[in-house]
C-alpha cells in the first residue's frame, strides 16, 4: 500500500533509505544506462524472444499487452524482471471494457462505471482492478482518463471517459486514482492538457484543446489541480495543443501555438508544474502517434520530449533506433544533462515510492497457481457483474416496447456490428451471450440476411446490436447502415415504422445521432459478457434499468428524443 500524500506533498517523497538507493543508482549509472531508463517499451507477444533485445537497452519500464495464456505472460514478465539490474516498472492501459485483460475479471469501462452513478461501486471496481493488476505484476496504470467528453463525435474519448460533466469526472477520477494508489499501483492522469473538445484523435493528428485560458482553469485546471493536491503520482502529456495558453505567453505565435503538449515546455513546466504545482513524474503519450509524428522529425522529437518536460518516453516502433536518437540528441545538445538527471531522479524515485527496489522477483510475481488463485475470484466476479447491471441505461422507449415478451416478440432479427479493438489480445466482441440469454427465454433469434430482409409477416422485432467502444485511430464511430444492411441501396431501408425496432449500443453512447427514428434505445457502454447477460435480463423485465447517462445521448438534438 502507498501512503497517501496530502496538501502540496511531493507524491514521489521517499524515506532516507530509499533516497540513498535512488542516489546510489543514479550516480553509478553510465550515460547509456540513464538514457535507457527514460524509455517504456511496449510488448504484446508474451514471449522471451520478443523481450530478448530489450535488456541491452536497460529500459526503465515495459508496457504489457497480454495474450490469453497466463503462463506465457508470467514467463515473459519474469524474464524481464530477472534480466534487469534496475527493477523495471510494468505499465498497462488498464481501462476495463473489452480491453479488460483476458485472464482477469472483466469490468465495465470507465463510462460504464460513471453510468452506475455510485462512487461506492467505482471504489469497489477500482479496488478489484488494482488488486488483480498487482497479481499480474503491474505497477503503474495509465489511468484514470480525466478527459471531458464534450465533442460527441470524438471516437477516442467517449467510453474511455467518465462523461461530459466535469464535476462527475472529478468525483469519479478522484476515487479511482486514490484506490489505485492505496493498492500499490501508481495512477496516471491523462490526456494532458485535456482531450474531449476536439472531434479528432491525437493518434492521427495533433488535436487541439480549444478552450480559453479562463475556461480551461474552470474545467481541466480544477480537475488536474484537485487530483495533484490529492497526491496523484504521474501525468501523461499528450500530443494535444492548447493554443490559448501558448499565445498568452507568446502573443505572436503562429504554428508554435499548436505544438503538442508532449514537446511543449510551456505546458509541461510552466502550466503543469509551475501553476498547478505538480511534482510527480510526467510521461509522454505513445510516441508513434500521428499527433507527434506529423509535427516534427523523429530525430528532433525523441530528445525534445525529455528536454521539454516529459520524464519518460512511451513506446517505440524501433527501440534501438529511438535509444540511439536519444544518445545523439544528448551529444548534440538537444537534450541537456540537467534534464536527463532530473528525469532519472524522478524515474528512480517513482520506483522506490512503489517499493520496487525492495522486492525480490518472486515478490513481484507469484508462482503461476498462486497468480491464478488471485484472479477472477468469485467475490470480484460478483462485484463486476453487479456493476455491469447497474450501468445499463435506458435512453428512451417511446413505443412502450419493453419488457420484451417471448409471445409478442418471439421472432427477432438481430442486425449486428461488433466493432474492433486496437490490440489483438482484447476480449472477444461477438454477441453470443445476449443471443443465448434471449434464446433460453423462448425467443427465436436469427441474424439479419440482406437477401431476405425482415418483414411484418416473419419478424416481431428488429434488434440492432452495435458495439464500438472509443478506440485509438477509429477516426469516426457511427451507424454504418451500408455495412449493417449489406448494400448502399439497402442502407436506405429503415424498419422502425413497419416492425418494432430497438437499438442497443455496447459501445459509444451516441448512435442515436445516426438513427433518430429508433423509438427504443439502450446504452450499455461495453460488450463484455456480464454486460450482455445483464442487458438481456433488463430487456425482459427481470431487473430494472438503473444506469444514469454520463453524457447527453441525444447529442443536443430534440429530434432524437421522440
Locate each region found by the language model.
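Preference for extracellular/luminal or secreted protein segments
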Residues: 1-58, 264-265, 274, 294-562
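Hydrophobic faces of well-ordered beta-strands that scaffold small-molecule active sites
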Residues: 35-43, 60-64, 88-96, 140-144, ...
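Glycine-rich tight-turn/loop motif centered on a GG-T
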Residues: 60-67, 106-121, 153-172, 201-218, ...
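Active-site-proximal loop/turn and secondary-structure-junction residues that shape catalytic pockets
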Residues: 68, 96, 146-147, 193-195, ...
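Second-shell residues forming the walls of enzyme active-site clefts
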Residues: 72-83, 98, 164-339, 346
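Short amphipathic alpha-helices and their capping/turn segments at secondary-structure boundaries
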Residues: 74-86, 123, 127-137, 172-182, ...
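Glycine-rich, aromatic-flanked loop segments that form ligand/cofactor-binding clefts
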Residues: 76-106, 122-149, 169-196
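Short, conserved phosphate-binding/catalytic loop or strand-edge motifs used
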Residues: 146-156, 322
Amino acid at each position: 500500500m502507498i501512503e497517501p500524500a496530502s496538501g502540496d506533498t511531493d507524491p514521489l517523497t521517499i524515506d532516507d533509505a530509499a533516497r540513498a538507493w535512488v542516489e546510489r543508482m543514479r550516480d553509478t549509472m553510465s550515460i547509456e544506462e540513464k538514457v535507457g531508463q527514460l524509455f517504456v517499451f511496449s510488448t504484446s507477444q508474451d514471449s522471451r524472444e520478443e523481450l530478448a533485445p530489450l535488456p541491452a537497452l536497460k529500459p526503465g519500464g515495459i508496457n504489457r499487452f497480454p495474450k490469453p495464456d497466463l503462463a506465457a505472460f508470467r514467463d515473459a514478465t519474469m524474464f524481464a524482471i530477472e534480466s534487469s539490474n534496475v527493477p523495471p516498472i510494468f505499465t498497462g492501459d488498464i481501462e476495463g471494457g473489452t480491453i479488460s485483460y483476458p485472464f482477469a475479471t472483466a469490468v465495465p469501462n470507465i463510462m460504464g462505471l460513471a453510468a452506475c452513478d455510485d462512487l461506492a461501486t467505482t471504489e469497489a471496481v477500482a479496488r478489484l482492478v488494482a488488486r488483480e493488476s498487482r497479481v499480474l505484476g503491474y505497477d503503474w496504470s495509465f489511468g484514470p482518463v480525466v478527459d471531458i467528453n464534450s465533442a460527441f463525435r470524438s471516437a477516442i474519448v467517449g467510453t474511455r471517459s467518465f462523461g461530459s460533466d466535469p464535476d462527475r469526472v472529478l468525483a469519479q477520477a478522484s476515487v479511482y486514482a486514490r484506490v489505485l494508489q492505496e493498492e500499490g499501483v501508481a495512477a496516471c492522469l491523462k490526456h494532458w492538457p485535456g482531450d474531449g473538445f476536439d472531434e479528432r484523435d491525437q493518434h492521427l493528428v495533433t488535436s487541439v484543446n480549444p478552450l480559453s485560458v479562463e475556461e480551461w482553469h474552470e474545467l481541466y485546471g480544477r480537475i488536474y489541480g484537485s487530483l495533484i493536491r490529492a497526491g496523484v503520482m504521474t501525468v501523461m502529456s499528450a500530443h494535444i495543443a492548447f493554443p490559448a495558453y501558448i499565445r498568452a505567453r507568446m502573443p505572436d505565435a503562429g504554428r508554435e501555438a499548436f505544438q503538442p503538449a508532449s514537446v511543449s515546455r510551456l505546458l509541461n513546466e510552466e502550466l503543469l508544474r509551475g501553476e498547478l504545482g505538480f511534482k510527480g513524474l510526467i510521461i509522454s503519450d505513445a510516441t508513434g502517434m500521428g499527433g507527434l509524428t506529423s509535427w516534427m522529425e523523429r530525430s528532433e522529437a525523441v530528445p525534445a520530449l525529455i528536454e521539454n518536460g516529459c520524464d519518460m518516453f512511451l513506446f517505440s516502433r524501433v527501440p534501438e533506433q529511438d535509444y540511439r536518437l536519444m544518445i545523439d540528441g544528448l551529444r548534440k545538445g538537444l537534450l541537456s544533462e540537467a534534464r536527463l538527471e532530473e528525469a532519472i531522479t524522478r524515474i528512480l524515485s517513482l520506483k522506490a515510492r512503489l517499493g520496487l527496489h525492495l522486492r525480490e522477483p518472486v515478490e513481484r510475481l507469484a508462482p503461476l497457481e498462486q497468480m491464478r488463485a488471485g484472479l477472477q475470484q468469485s467475490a470480484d466476479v460478483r462485484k463486476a457483474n453487479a456493476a455491469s447491471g447497474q450501468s445499463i441505461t435506458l435512453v428512451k422507449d417511446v413505443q412502450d416496447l419493453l419488457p420484451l415478451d417471448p409471445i409478442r416478440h418471439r421472432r427477432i432479427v438481430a442486425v449486428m456490428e461488433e466493432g474492433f479493438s486496437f490490440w489483438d489480445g482484447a476480449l472477444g466482441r461477438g454477441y453470443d451471450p445476449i443471443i443465448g440469454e434471449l434464446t433460453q427465454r423462448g425467443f427465436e433469434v436469427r441474424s439479419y440476411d440482406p437477401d431476405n430482409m425482415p418483414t411484418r409477416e416473419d419478424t416481431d422485432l428488429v434488434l440492432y446490436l452495435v458495439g464500438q467502444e472509443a478506440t485509438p485511430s477509429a477516426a469516426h464511430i457511427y451507424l454504418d447502415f451500408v455495412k449493417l444492411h449489406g448494400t448502399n441501396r439497402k442502407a436506405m431501408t429503415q424498419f422502425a415504422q413497419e416492425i418494432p425496432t430497438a437499438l442497443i449500443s455496447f459501445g459509444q453512447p451516441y448512435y442515436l445521432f445516426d438513427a433518430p427514428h429508433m423509438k427504443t434505445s439502450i446504452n450499455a457502454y461495453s460488450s463484455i459478457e456480464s454486460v450482455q447477460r445483464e442487458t438481456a435480463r433488463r430487456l425482459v423485465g427481470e431487473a430494472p434499468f438503473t444506469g444514469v447517462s454520463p453524457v447527453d445521448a441525444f447529442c443536443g438534438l430534440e429530434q432524437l428524443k421522440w
